[in-house]
A protein has these predicted regions:
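Long, highly charged amphipathic alpha-helices
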Residues: 23-26, 82-86
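Short S/T/G/P-rich N-terminal loop/turn motif that feeds into the first structured element of a domain
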Residues: 1-58, 66-76, 99-103
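A common structural junction motif
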Residues: 32-36, 79-85, 91
Length: 103
């Protein structure tokens, strides 16, 4: 199955304090109602062990959008802004974002 016309937004989060994991999960769950998002996956590193796998992050967020414009709308959505300010910035030591589009 090919994900045609898809903008992929993949975010990895490294917590300052591991004890804040459930709090960050609650924050990520606040993003679910954002209408610009087509699909959402909140996850943790899989139990896989290969040299090319980075399992150092604490949580990941994978979002699928129908277009770059939908992703831009997500960035400006007040729910996303509140998540970034209230959860990601205070709780995370590092955040890495990888965006991709179809070839």
């Amino acid at each position: 199955m090919s994900l045609n016309n898809t903008f992929v937004h993949h975010v990895h989060f490294w917590l300052k304090n591991k004890e804040d994991k459930s709090r960050l999960i609650r924050g990520l769950e606040t993003l679910i109602p954002i209408t610009h998002i087509r699909d959402i996956h909140i996850g943790v590193p899989a139990d896989t062990d290969r040299d090319v796998i980075d399992r150092s992050y604490d949580l990941s967020l994978l979002l699928l959008f129908d277009s770059p414009e939908a992703q831009a709308g997500y960035q400006d959505d007040p729910i996303h802004v509140a998540f970034a300010e209230g959860y990601a910035k205070p709780l995370c030591a590092k955040v890495v974002v990888q965006d991709s589009v179809n070839i």
